[in-house]
């Protein structure tokens, strides 16, 4: 059996060896909750990777959004090139959930665009868990949403070997039960085709490789893997396991039982609605549900099948749904990254989902069993956990209360120390700020300024522009692509000061930033809480000249705690550096990578703008259609490489081109 093998030029330094040893010891001793309190830039991902290598267990890494999950997945793939590092996030590029607005009698049907690549990666993740133990899955919070039964998923998996007695038509029936679709012309993921005694299957978890099964009578003669594009044979296989094409598969017996159970629930609900005089709702529900039942009987599938997941899996009402967590073996470990954000997000998922379903059930769009197609409640989530390590620079009260050990990682490999903090009175703050900005600009350094309101941010930006400072304002309406471009321009020195309200979102750990100015630091609220302040202070921790200025007339409790905690860390870091003769260095590594990524985004944008203006106008309808196909290929390629921002940009260009047809 393959083992986790970490490949890296790094050696653990600073606090890392102690943190790795203590966290590993905690897991081996069976401790359920631990916290890695790691400051910005201390190499938390490397510590996580070393712990995984030490304990050799399947691992789930939970991140609070897709972008962060993609970053982590790329890092873990670099650390573990020989192991299965998988990616599991919501596969919707665009998702409008089903909803009903009673005030205007508006029913909004579920509308979504499923990203084929991400769907493939999800299948790759679940199938890896059944095939091996050296698996790391990096997931967003969408992994606590309902998924089909792992038992049915595994039971329907087909295992084939050369020499096996197996009728070709029997294998075809099995594939159809697993929701594979026969298509002899358009061969794609989740489909199969038949040519005489040769059956070719394109597994749901693959992008470019398919399986060819050759029969001789009732016996499998040969199994080969081939490249779908070139047709070239990659190699012969002694065994192949084909996993279902959907996570919502069920056995024939369970499907029969499910249909009977749906019919019984429908009859009961219709009685209730009619007794309340809700005849329109009753008629609507009957019409919609009967259509779904008919589809299930004929096809084994229907639109919105997830709303019947409780019936399909045979679970009692109100019981927790199956999720990705159920696909893991019992001894798995879990890292919850940026836990101070991720844990509250997990808590909020259930209530938001229930509120939307209330109106759908009340007005006859769905049966009450639709409530059971839902995310886990927080209590159910806790019950499914085995051993967890919370990872954050500012763990929340939940993590601190639950953890049997809190392991600090305060020393950075670069020797950088936390920034010094100065509190300045509000009177004359703008003139003082301008003076500080000019000092930084002379040294070719950058400045972040955080305000509390949009109005304040806009006014400040205008004022700074008027006095000759190169400044930009980043607000919440800016999309990811533009955001990356603004960050790129800041790093390249196209402007010197970035003003924003919430500068805590990912991607703003910039080595060039030597000053963070916090306006209205003494106003109580979530943007000026202890956690937010510490996270904001961390934005200046990647530069050797890092400094934070808080503009305030009084020192609030949150400010005092943030200042004390920063000074405590600073003292430890300075003492360590003096003891080991370390001279702090501004972070250099990674600048080029980030600039490359963002430059290419900008180049793509410029390329498409030029193409659109100069070429598209002169294209025929057929040429535009051909160009759209090329862009779709490029979009899929970018998604495979986890370059979701670039892929989204190409997708937007496709939408614009389709409007011209």
Swiss-Prot record:
Give residue ranges for domain Helicase C-terminal.
Answer: 429-591
The source's superkingdom equals Bacteria
Query: Is Aminoacyl-tRNA synthetase one of the keywords UniProt gives this record?
Result: no
Q: Which positions fall inside the UVR domain?
A: 625-660
Q: Which GO MF terms does the UniProt record name?
A: ATP binding; ATP hydrolysis activity; DNA binding; excinuclease ABC activity; helicase activity
Q: Where in the cell is it found?
A: Cytoplasm
Gene Ontology BP term (one): SOS response
Locate the residues binding ATP.
Answer: 38-45
State the UniProt keywords alphabetically.
ATP-binding, Cytoplasm, DNA damage, DNA excision, DNA repair, Excision nuclease, Helicase, Hydrolase, Nucleotide-binding, SOS response
In terms of SMART domains, this protein maps to:
DEXDc, HELICc
GO cellular component terms, semicolon-separated: cytoplasm; excinuclease repair complex
Transport as a keyword of this entry, yes or no, is no
| Residue ranges of every copy of the Helicase ATP-binding domain listed in the record | 25-178
Q: Where is this motif: Beta-hairpin?
A: 91-114
What the entry lists under SUPFAM superfamilies is as follows: C-terminal UvrC-binding domain of UvrB, P-loop containing nucleoside triphosphate hydrolases
Cross-referenced InterPro entries: Helicase/UvrB_N, Helicase_ATP-bd, Helicase_C-like, P-loop_NTPase, UVR_dom, UVR_dom_sf, UvrB, UvrB_inter
PANTHER family reported in the protein's UniProt record: UVRABC SYSTEM PROTEIN B (PTHR24029:SF0)
Q: What does the subunit comment say? A: Forms a heterotetramer with UvrA during the search for lesions. Interacts with UvrC in an incision complex.
Share the domain note from the entry. The beta-hairpin motif is involved in DNA binding.
Q: What does this protein do?
A: The UvrABC repair system catalyzes the recognition and processing of DNA lesions. A damage recognition complex composed of 2 UvrA and 2 UvrB subunits scans DNA for abnormalities. Upon binding of the UvrA(2)B(2) complex to a putative damaged site, the DNA wraps around one UvrB monomer. DNA wrap is dependent on ATP binding by UvrB and probably causes local melting of the DNA helix, facilitating insertion of UvrB beta-hairpin between the DNA strands. Then UvrB probes one DNA strand for the presence of a lesion.
Name the family: Belongs to the UvrB family.
The record's listing under NCBIfam families reads: PRK05298.1, uvrb
The name this protein goes by in its record: UvrABC system protein B
- Organism of derivation: Caldicellulosiruptor bescii (strain ATCC BAA-1888 / DSM 6725 / KCTC 15123 / Z-1320)
Lineage, uppermost ranks: Bacteria, Bacillati, Bacillota, Bacillota incertae sedis, Caldicellulosiruptorales
